[in-house]
């Protein structure tokens, strides 16, 4: 068996092949109308199927397929765009595209399952472009490749099987979504529920049907007779018809070129130039495919050419196996005995009973074994030899029917067709196709099932040997012929489909004049008389005779009657009335059988109520006795006719009655077509219900909620993801074990219960206890605010005064820790700017001088100047002095009701009403460790501290000063602040013309005399400080400010300015004294305090000089600090020189009242302070030498004790400690003194060095006199300096 190489793809349809031959011979004009309908129906169906395969979508419903033009390779997102492009703008072809049998037949770029499939289909795309590259417009979402076309990208994505979890069970194509896979499977299952009402086309999607309906639009009245496509003009139709002609010429050319191709092996696809080489190759490499290799091993699928090779193979490969007959239970001692016994299964025995296949079995054996379905019958997938052979030169069969020709069997699973006996076929099935499911073989006469073909042969030979049921010999007739046209088909399924499509439509009538030519010998129908004459010459004339036989010659062959079910949509064909009856009883219960016989009166052809079966029959038959008597019986009504013409006329009446009306068996309603009847009949039997099916276990649920609950309970896995190492675990226990093993770094912290300090090492805690608690056992007095201990009650009372707010506002009774906070409060809340004489912080005076200046009586200042513009303003936070206030003795918070105070004490200090002071102190000790830098309140959590800090920030400040960068909540406060940057002298003199100004009116009028041309807003500027003003209000504020300064300076120089005198308070009894001489100066932890004589007498107990705690031996320099500013000095001479220069007014000889003529204090010399030890130096060289000594002794590495990070300078360490202080604060850094906000820690550090001095530091070290701005500085200092 030799086969030439052919193109891969689907085999051409028989009807299309016959149509092509007729068209080539007679042209399109001679094509009959019914055959045109047949060809169009098949072409439409094929085009629809291919289109649905191409247009399958693998994305969301909104993301439809990408459609590519065949000519210009341009991609489109929808079929409508592609249709418009090909109809109007495509340069390659417009209306004459032969592939556009309907609009949506353009291939989709998503239709490619693999590159090899595309190449096999004849794709001529460049391999270099398909491989992809980089920088191309369509990148892959799973890898780094990109492609020049979207179709290449979709083809490439199929290799990412791990990203496409859903797979088609038919073609192994991969999909990203399940819904895309389900839509694709419809292409394989043929689920097409959208039907065209104009033609027989069906679609699985509604959008495809809508596009197809455009071809039937009335706007395109000119229809193509081949593909039924509509056109708007005759010229377009003629151009389209030329495309059909070119397509047929191309097919003819391709067939001619295919004959010149090399010969290809069917098994390994090797090609050979000569048939002899192909035969030699098949014999040596694939003996199972060769016709000469007919010796098969009884144990395995191997096939051999000669007996010696077969016997050698059995002795080598199957020497230990028993030699058993595959057809029966007998066993033999040698291989030769097995093969001799196998001959008895196919040779006649001594009793002359033929053991060869029975004629009945020969007609149906291969058909019944053709399908792997155990319940399949002859009408489903029979496999006689499908190769169409011409029916020429066939000899007539003998009338006695005894000369049966040899039956050839074919395998239903492979291309092997030539099996001389059932035994050989059975061996082939059991060895080569052992993996196939076991199937039963049905007897065509009694419908009994047999396990093997051999058993079926024996059954037919014994039970149905004399059965008179006529059968057709497939060994002699190689094809099935249609009764209504010259079409031939290889199997019954193709014949049944052809009859249903071509001859059972609403317009198809096989009884018209063109189909009235039937052969008298075999009852085959033909279109023309010439075709009938040619058929008789070829099929029913002897080889040597050229004359036509008489049309009345009786047929000598037996034919098989074919019955079709009238209730099924696909009209299956059955070989016997028994099988049809069984089919109706199983599938159409309670429906009367259409083939039930009636009385002869009811069977009259004249009656219009005759019920007949479907006209789809493969052969017209008659019994042998009737034919021999010259009668033609009708198998529909049992009438007999003497000649063939009468019989043919009678049969046409049956067909006309059947096609005229079809009645519903339930309600007797008539319908024009079987499809309409089926749709109507379905309504009688149909009940609809909605169920939701689980894809995994196929369980059904009545609601979506039940399905989701089932999926969550049965098919959902909860995974636990470790955010530290990104590992995933399937149970809670697993991740707990993982966290305990890998991420549980146990680290002990040692806390001092007395002062709540934490230490990383036990040795550090021991050092802390040694220096802080063990060395001072007599310090029993502890501060309830900071936990510091003192030896006596006097020292504790002196220390408590440091927690009070020293600077009080005279307007609203508010108190502040630092003078700068009081000044800021006065400017923002009370709009008081004259701070030179009243608050001791005049512009231009160094910060150290503010401490020496006496606080002013602001109320007296307002009495002197009642016209001050801001004296009437009151703050929202002002407290009415007339209401009774209840203050908290722990944090100083004041409330108007006692209940509010009790709630505050319970919420913030955990002190319940009625508890004594001991419980309060105990609760204070266990108070939280998060301390507010503004009001010193503590909190248990960082979140509580963060919420508390929001109360200090006040309203949003959107107006920033262009000079210092400070922000203000309103434009008015910003304007008042900008005035404070004035650097003019106290003389209200114009800096342009030197004219003195005495009042605000003079100032405003004089400013108009010197306009500022650069100021586009107002055109003016302040003539005293030369600042640009943005509004008239700002100019008035400048005038008020400068005139107040002038009045204040004159008041300070007048004798009346000496009336204000500072009062000094005792630190213990808080009594006020007019002179410092009335108080005794004490030094407690490096800070100066004053006690009156009475307190000293009551508390000293004879130890006046022992009030100050003794200095430890390891602090020799603790006493060399300035008692006023706490600056450390290395020698007593330096301290004395510092006191003479910087604190001359406080020395005994100058401690009296200051002279009235002195208007400004002595300016302080510029000093340099070490960041590490806070020592002060007079020049830069000395501090450089000091820093060098630090580097020599301690090295250049400075460690942060909080996180063990190293830095190469103390400044960087200080900046790092500032970052520690503001961790979790949103990336903002706020000055603890003036509350200016910065976004960088180094900016805050620069701000502290430039603006604030030693007196503004908040946190004091309990073991040395050093002070710090931040608590983290104090912690790092304690752990590094006092832990040893």
From Swiss-Prot:
It is linked to Nephronophthisis 14: An autosomal recessive disorder manifesting as infantile-onset kidney disease, cerebellar vermis hypoplasia, and situs inversus. Nephronophthisis is a progressive tubulo-interstitial kidney disorder histologically characterized by modifications of the tubules with thickening of the basement membrane, interstitial fibrosis and, in the advanced stages, medullary cysts. Residues 102-117 have a biased composition (Polar residues). This is Zinc finger protein 423. Residues 34-46, 1136-1147 have a biased composition (Basic and acidic residues). GO terms for biological process: cell differentiation; negative regulation of cold-induced thermogenesis; negative regulation of DNA-templated transcription; nervous system development; Notch signaling pathway; positive regulation of BMP signaling pathway; positive regulation of DNA-templated transcription; protein localization to cilium. A zinc finger (C2H2-type) spans 67-93, 138-160, 166-188, 194-216, 222-244, 263-286, 295-318, 323-345, 409-433, 441-464, 480-503, 517-540, 563-588, 632-654, 662-684, 692-715, 720-743, 750-773, 781-803, 807-830, 886-908, 930-952, 959-981, 1020-1042, 1064-1082, 1120-1143, 1168-1190, 1198-1220, 1229-1252, 1259-1282. GO terms for molecular function: DNA-binding transcription factor activity, RNA polymerase II-specific; RNA polymerase II cis-regulatory region sequence-specific DNA binding; sequence-specific DNA binding; zinc ion binding. Pfam families: zf-C2H2, zf-C2H2_6. Belongs to the krueppel C2H2-type zinc-finger protein family. Residues 54-64 have a biased composition (Acidic residues). Expressed in brain, lung, skeletal muscle, heart, pancreas and kidney but not liver or placenta. Also expressed in aorta, ovary, pituitary, small intestine, fetal brain, fetal kidney and, within the adult brain, in the substantia nigra, medulla, amygdala, thalamus and cerebellum. Changing residue 913 to L: In NPHP14; found at homozygosity in two siblings with nephronophthisis, cerebellar vermis hypoplasia and situs inversus. Changing residue 574 to A: Abolishes the ability to bind promoter of BMP target genes. SMART domains: ZnF_C2H2. Transcription factor that can both act as an activator or a repressor depending on the context. Plays a central role in BMP signaling and olfactory neurogenesis. Associates with SMADs in response to BMP2 leading to activate transcription of BMP target genes. Acts as a transcriptional repressor via its interaction with EBF1, a transcription factor involved in terminal olfactory receptor neurons differentiation; this interaction preventing EBF1 to bind DNA and activate olfactory-specific genes. It is found in: Nucleus. It comes from the Eukaryota.
